[in-house]
Amino acid sequence: GACGLMQLMPATAKWFAENKVRIEYSEEMLFEPEYNIRLGCAYLDYLKGRFDGNMGSVLAAYNAGEGIVRQWLNSSLYSADGENLNAIPYPETENYVERVQDTYDMYVRLYREN
């Protein structure tokens, strides 16, 4: 399953570390907070670029995988325009996206008030 603070899947983390950010990788390193956060944040930034900053798609891809989100975006069942998800067929991913977006919105409101 997913490892460390950023809950990275080992296969995805290995591919990303070795092919995109070109840093050392071992599954044990995923349990080192500094390494895990560094790799997880870099992966989120990578997904942000791949999905043109569309945070719904970025978060869905972080949770379910980039390939499956691309399939959803190419399906009229889940996307009317190929850029935005109208529906997410995985309940876990749908809940994840909603929770993260709700938490983000809460922090935006909190920091605007202060």
Region annotations inferred by a language model:
Residues 32, 52, 105-109:
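A general structural signal for short secondary-structure boundary/capping elements
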Residues 2-3, 23-33, 47-49, 83-90:
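Second-shell loop/turn segments in exported
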Residues 1-23, 35-43, 100:
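Substrate-binding/active-site groove segments that recognize
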Residues 30, 34-38, 56, 94:
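Non-membrane alpha-helical structural segments and their capping/turn regions in soluble enzymes
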Residues 25-28, 50-61, 114:
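Surface-exposed patches in mature extracellular/periplasmic domains of secreted proteins
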Residues 17, 44-45, 62, 104:
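Generic helix-packing signal
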Residues 57-114:
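Catalytic and substrate-binding regions of cell-wall glycan-acting enzymes that process beta-1,4-linked
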